[in-house]
Structure formats: structure tokens, C-alpha cells
């Protein structure tokens, strides 16, 4: 019975863009760009922190947070301290994300995905484990395509 249960778990797959693990060459991508809230951001960072190689968060805006949006975005950067190696923030709240991240040398802010694309090879090596997380409205599947194209 235990082998049957294990085999059923092995057959499970995550929903597209929800904690979806993608292997691409020497890179592992955690595609979690379907939705984002403060709680789900923290949970995803916790998953990323379990990996042994260099850990990178590419984070976009969390939508529909109201007047506390800046606070929640900066809270995520504080939470990520000592759990990840690099933080890449893209979107309206990019500065708030980097506000409390302690390693400023490894915190990168971009207004648009296109700006990130122009700089990606200067920041990443293509061997990292990368969490990609944002609200659906940010269309972060484009980031995955950029990573596949550049590496």
C-alpha cells in the first residue's frame, strides 16, 4: 500500500504557473506567477530556501493590496533576508521590495520586464534556482521565456 500511495504522489503534477518546477539546462525555475499575496510570497520563498544552490527571487507586483501595498512589498524583502542570495524586483513596487533587503549589492530593480531582459545576463549565470512570483496581471510568464531565451 505505501508504494501505491507513493506512486500516486509521483504522478501528481502542479497546476500551471503554481509552484511548477521547471528544469532548463542548468537552471531550476519555480514558476509561481499565477497569483501573489503576502502569505503566498512568504511560502514560496520558504520553498526556494530549501534548495542548496544559489537562490534567486524574481518578484513582481502583488495586486489588490490597497493602501498598504508599499508596506506589504517591503515586508517581503525583509522576510527574504538570509533565505535567498539575490532579489530581482520588477514593476511598480520594485523599490519597496528592495527597501529592507540587506544585501544591496544583490538587489536589482527594474521598472519593466523589458528592462530586466536587457540586463539579465549581467545578473544571472544560468545555474541558479529561481523563484518567479507575481500577480497574474504582471504577466511574468514572459520572464520565464526570457530566461529560456538568454540561457
Where do the protein language model's features map onto the residues?
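ATP-dependent carboxylate-amine ligase
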Residues: 1-151
